[in-house]
Amino acid sequence: MYRALRFSVRTALRLYFGRIDADMRSAPRPGTLLLACNHPNSFLDALLVATHLPQRMCFLARGDAFRNPIAAMLLRALYMIPVYRMSEGRARLRQTTKSFRSANKELLSGRSVLVFAEGLSVNQPGLRPLGKGAARIAAMTWKGGADIAVVPVWLEYGRFHQPFAEVALRTGTLIENGVLSAQAEALFLRGFNTVLRRRLLEMAETVSFGQVPAHGGAFRRFLLAPPALAGLLLHAPWYFAVRLLTAALTRGTIFFDSVLFGLLFLSYPLWLLLLTATGLLLGLQGWAWLVWPVVPFTLWLLNRWRRKP
């Protein structure tokens, strides 16, 4: 089930983004990992990381997303663990200590854990001040005797809220038990974040957008233009309807891209079913079922056509 869902989401991400430039070679495969990532685009960040590494993982997510009981049940089913900030009150903050223990328990059981090191997600490029979550979990795990590496992960988007955006993923030099000598907790947390910040910024320097390799140049785009236009016409009504709904649901939040992707992912089979039903009503009979392989293929061709030489 997990593998099927992971494959489906990864395929959908490849259609949603114009290009995913992923270099995850430094992450051990297999192996239990504590992944410490920057956080530019809410839940979409978790999907990108989880679908580009083979490890099964759970995620630390902002606690306010768990306020709705139904949402909380769904998020926990997706192996998400709530974490809270000081601004949400001391009672909530105490729950975060329990969340760190839960993350440590998952690591010891063999499941990798993804932590967003900045804590707060903001739709902006660059690296913000790091929180202490990743450092605290690492300290807890290492003190317990587990030899689990911390993998710095860098995520960067070419732009936000636009179709076919570029995104880059990188994994950096591992932070291993023993890299930081035994220290008092405050010194350890500060030293850990100093090392993590340096390695995240090293990865950021390797990202360059707009340099997509073109194959065939202008002639290739000429050949792709007719099916790409078909892909645009077949998908535009569905896409813009879902986009308008997403804008209404996420007004004033940073969840636009995440909710848009989620709604597109869930509603796409319904859109294909509607197109199939339309074909049957028009008397196309068996030909109508070609919607299922052909229409997604035209979307893929539209994505490729947009890569200008």
Question: Where would I find each of the regions flagged by the language model?
Answer:
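Transmembrane alpha-helical segments and their cytosolic interface motifs
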Residues: 218-237
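Short His/Asp/Glu-rich catalytic/ion-coordination signatures at enzyme active sites or charged loops
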Residues: 179
